[in-house]
Regions:
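Helix-to-loop junctions at the C-terminal end of transmembrane segments
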Residues: 56-68, 149
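Helix-breaking motifs and short loop linkers at transmembrane-helix boundaries and internal kinks
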Residues: 68, 89-91
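Residue-level signature of mid-helix packing/kink "hotspots" within the transmembrane helices
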Residues: 50-54, 58, 142-143
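Paired small-residue
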Residues: 94-102
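Helix-loop boundary and gating motifs at the non-cytosolic
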Residues: 3-50
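Structural signature of the two symmetry-related core transmembrane helices
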Residues: 71-86
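Loop-to-transmembrane helix entry/capping segments in MFS-fold secondary transporters
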Residues: 39-40, 124-134
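Intracellular juxtamembrane helix-capping segments at the cytosolic ends
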Residues: 28, 109-122
Length: 152
């Protein structure tokens, strides 16, 4: 029962992060265009995410080894959330590129942490089912975040 609760919490945390990330990815492009950002700047904002994602994938395993899954996930989720909120305060293309890269770093880290954590708590018989549910939850949440733009 304890492992089911752990997995449920991981799914919920991942879903919330991916919802926010899905909304952020689409909303920044729309808002940047409304603010008059150049097409180059809008492209670099999207590229910043990818650069941050690669950097996070390479760096976060070291963080997990030092502080553990729970603390590392908490830090990635907190910083990822803060970067999204800072986009509201700093409305210029350079800061959005940097914030988007930091956001990509945190989202890659959070995904890596959740996936390694799920790998640890799943046995060989349930691992495929666990990961298929995880991927379904995160893709649904990301899509729902993108669709939420109609509400904003």
């Amino acid at each position: 029962m304890a492992s089911v609760i752990k997995i449920y919490a991981l799914f919920l945390g991942s879903a919330l992060l991916m919802f926010g990330g899905g909304l952020q990815g689409l909303l920044l492009s729309v808002r940047g265009a409304e603010e008059g950002f150049s097409l180059l700047a809008l492209g670099l904002i999207g590229t910043g995410w990818s650069i941050g994602f690669v950097a996070g994938s390479l760096t976060v395993p070291l963080v997990v080894r030092k502080v553990g899954h729970i603390r590392a996930f908490s830090v990635m989720a907190a910083i990822g959330t803060i970067t999204i909120l800072l986009n509201l305060l700093w409305i210029n293309d350079i800061s959005w590129i940097v914030l988007r890269a930091l956001s990509g770093f945190c989202f890659a880290g959070a995904a890596m942490i959740v996936e390694s954590w799920l790998n640890e708590v799943s046995d060989n018989r349930s691992r495929g089912t666990t990961f298929s549910i995880y991927v379904s939850v995160t893709l649904f949440a990301s899509t729902a975040g993108q669709m939420a733009i109609s509400i904003t």
